[in-house]
Regions:
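Carbohydrate-active catalytic/glycan-binding domains of CAZyme proteins
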Residues: 1-107
Length: 107
C-alpha cells in the first residue's frame, strides 16, 4: 500500500518514552492511505504498526480515492486518539474526515 512513496509525517511522544509517527503511504500517484510507526527515540528504528494502513479509502464515499494529511491529537482525558485527515473522491472533490481510536494503545 506504500510502494510508490511515503511522506507527510507527524510525530508525537508517547507516555512510555517511545514516539509514534503518522504518515501518508502512496500505492500510486492518486491513491493514498495513512499509516503509523513506532520508534524508541523518535529518530531511528521505526517499526510499522501491524494494523497498517490505519486509514484507507472507502468505496463510494467522500474519501474513495485517497486519505492523506493526517493531523492527530492524543486525548488522555477521554482515553482516545483523534485523527483528522483530508479525503478525496475524484468525482466529488475534497473533504475533511475524522477517525476516533478508542483507547491510548495503538499496537
Amino acid at each position: 500500500w506504500e510502494q510508490d512513496r511515503i511522506g507527510g509525517c507527524e510525530v508525537h511522544p508517547l507516555p512510555d518514552g517511545r514516539w509514534v509517527m503518522f504518515y501518508i503511504g502512496y500505492s500510486d500517484i492518486h491513491t493514498a492511505r495513512i499509516g503509523a510507526a513506532i520508534s524508541p527515540d523518535g529518530v531511528t528504528r521505526w517499526t510499522r504498526l501491524k494494523t497498517n494502513p490505519i486509514v484507507s479509502p472507502t468505496p463510494d464515499t467522500f474519501d474513495a480515492s485517497a486519505c492523506y494529511k493526517p493531523s492527530v491529537f492524543r486525548d488522555d482525558k477521554g482515553e482516545r486518539w483523534l485523527l483528522w485527515y483530508n479525503g478525496r473522491n475524484t468525482n466529488k472533490g475534497e473533504y475533511i474526515g475524522l477517525v476516533i481510536h478508542k483507547g491510548l494503545d495503538l499496537e
